[in-house]
Amino acid sequence: MTNEKRAAEATPTDMGKDTKNQLIQQGMDYISAIGAELDRCSQLAESIPANIGLFLIKSANQTIKEAALRPNPNALWLSLWYEGECCCLFADSNLGKSIYAVQIATQIAESQKVLYFDFELSDKQFQLRYTDAQGNLYQFPKNLYRVEINRDSLGAGDFEEAVISNLEEAAKQTNAKVFIIDNITYLSIATEKGDAAGSLMMRLMHLKRKYDLSLLILAHTPKRALSNPITQNDLAGSKKLYNFFDSVFAIGKSAKDSNLRYIKQLKVRFGSYEYDADNVIVSTIEKVGSFLQFINIGYATEMEHLKEMSEKDVSQQTEEIKRLFQQGKSIRDIANQLNISKSKVGRILKK
């Protein structure tokens, strides 16, 4: 019997499980596509336009049916960063956020192209970080590309405009879908200002959608008290920055051991909180061979790694709360400024 005849006479029970699953999925996709088209026609029949200027209008049913035809995003790094997201990693200086970002980039580059925009280290500093005591260099995946600013090409024009424009050119010319930017300060020196921060993030969102990018942007945090938990208020710059990010996580320093770091998840849009204050990732930074990296040593509550306030600390905090309140600050403003809860501010003011 010829192969063609066998194929023609094959029954569903003869088919492999994968083949049957593919056919079932194709059937479901066709049904969803037909349903979405029917919803679109129904919308037109009711004289609701498909677009008005900047806005695209679809029924909720059409929206989810069309979205269901696209694959769900895959996790790029644990549950902290997913495909298609603009994610932020922030930490205080010298806590290892660049080390962690390169570690993330290295893992992702095992399967796809990654551009790491390094605006922090020189090439020599980068080389020394990934060289062991015997002078052996770490061998990175071939898909990992480090990008730095060519100082010779800097002109007298708008630096921020040039950086954004060249990010777009990098997306066009490399076809890379994963960008890690270290750090946001080099995208805009005015991120402290709300309007400038909003404009910057709008442009990044445009690039993300236009080229189907996944972005991880590193940022700093001002000096913070080790007795306070990490919150969104610790992200340096305008609060508008935080609102634009799809996901956010941060690195904190343990108060009980200066060699320990903990990683806390602060914002999630896909999936659920896995590494919140009740389950932070506890790590040490070690050089294994010639690769400097975070080593996961377990999980803990954030509270276990916060500094206990002394009587002097409590007294200073109380005086600061009263001083700010006398200046006319609201309880919310005081809580945000001191990075504590509104209920705690209220309790102290009632004493």
Per-region residue spans from a language model:
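N-terminal pre-Walker A segment at the start of P-loop NTPase domains
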Residues: 48-76
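C-terminal regions of RecA-like/P-loop NTPase motor modules
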Residues: 20-42, 54, 172-173, 210, ...
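Phosphate-binding/switch region of NTP-binding enzymes
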Residues: 88-90, 94, 99, 112, ...
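Positively charged N-terminal leader segments that act as targeting/secretion signals
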Residues: 2-16
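Conserved inter-motif catalytic segment of the P-loop NTP-binding fold
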Residues: 72, 76-78, 82, 112-199, ...
